[in-house]
Amino acid sequence: MKQYILVCCLILGAFSSGRLCAQESGTASFYDNYFNGKKMAGGGLFDNTKMTCAHKTLPFGTMLKVTNLANDKSVTVKVTDRGPYVKGRVLDLTKAAAKELGFVNNGTAHVMYEIIRDDKAEPVDSIQFQNSQFIT
C-alpha cells in the first residue's frame, strides 16, 4: 500500500502543471544620479536610464514585474544590484523605472513585485521572501 501511495504521488508530481509564483509588496525608492557610472554588485556599471533594480537576495538577472499600487502602472526590471539598505524598503529602482511608475516626485512608492523570469538555475519557487503571498 505504501508503494502504491508513493507511485501515485510521484505521478501527480510529474504531471503537476504549475509552479508557485511569489509576490511581495513594500516601499520602493530610486537611485540618485550620483550613482551613474559606478560599479554595481552584479559587476556592471550603473545607468539610471536603464530598467534595472536592486534587491537584497534575488539572483542577478532575475526579471521582475513591478507595479505601483497607487496608480496601477507597471514596469519590467532586471535585478543588477544589491540593496536597498534603508529599513522598510524592498527595491531600489532606476530613475527611468521610477518615472514609468510615476513616483519620481514623491521619492518612494508602495509597490508590488513578482518574478516573471529567473535566468539562473535556481527555481523560482525556492526563493525565500518575507511576507510572501503564493498563488498557483
Language-model region placement:
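Secreted/periplasmic proteins
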Residues: 4-5, 20-136
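Hydrophobic helical h-region of N-terminal Sec-dependent signal peptides
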Residues: 6-11
